[in-house]
């Protein structure tokens, strides 16, 4: 399974959409995970128009109807295991790991956690 990861695309009416080379790469995916800050329904429609299944979560810059349409977090089930998608890792007592455990409600640890918000790519 090939998964495309997006976050913080900030696509709104009248603003540029994703670069053509990125769109071509995403079309080759089986699933696109968007970790928030799509910004409005226009942006979500642009991502969904790429083709593969899209699972998106809400971010701090999302507005209007989009906030009601998207969940705070999503667990994508893949053949390799569960992938947790959320916008920002919580800054709460106990740290991110404890917060993730609480979000998942004891359903086991995910294979990976995908988040956005920082605008800095990072793999840990």
Where do the protein language model's features map onto the residues?
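Conserved catalytic scaffold of divalent metal-dependent phosphoesterases
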Residues: 3-17, 21-34, 38-124
């Amino acid at each position: 399974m090939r998964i495309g990861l997006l976050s913080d695309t900030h696509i709104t009416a009248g603003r540029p959409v994703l670069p053509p080379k990125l769109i071509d790469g995403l079309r080759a995916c089986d699933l696109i995970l968007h970790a928030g800050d799509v910004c409005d329904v226009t942006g979500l429609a642009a991502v969904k128009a790429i083709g593969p299944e899209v699972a998106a979560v809400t971010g701090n810059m999302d507005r209007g109807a989009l906030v009601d349409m998207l969940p705070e977090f999503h667990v994508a089930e893949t053949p390799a295991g569960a992938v947790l998608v959320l916008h920002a890792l919580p800054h709460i007592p106990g740290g991110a790991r404890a917060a993730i455990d609480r979000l998942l409600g004891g359903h086991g640890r995910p294979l990976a956690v995908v988040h956005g918000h920082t605008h800095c790519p990072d793999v840990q």
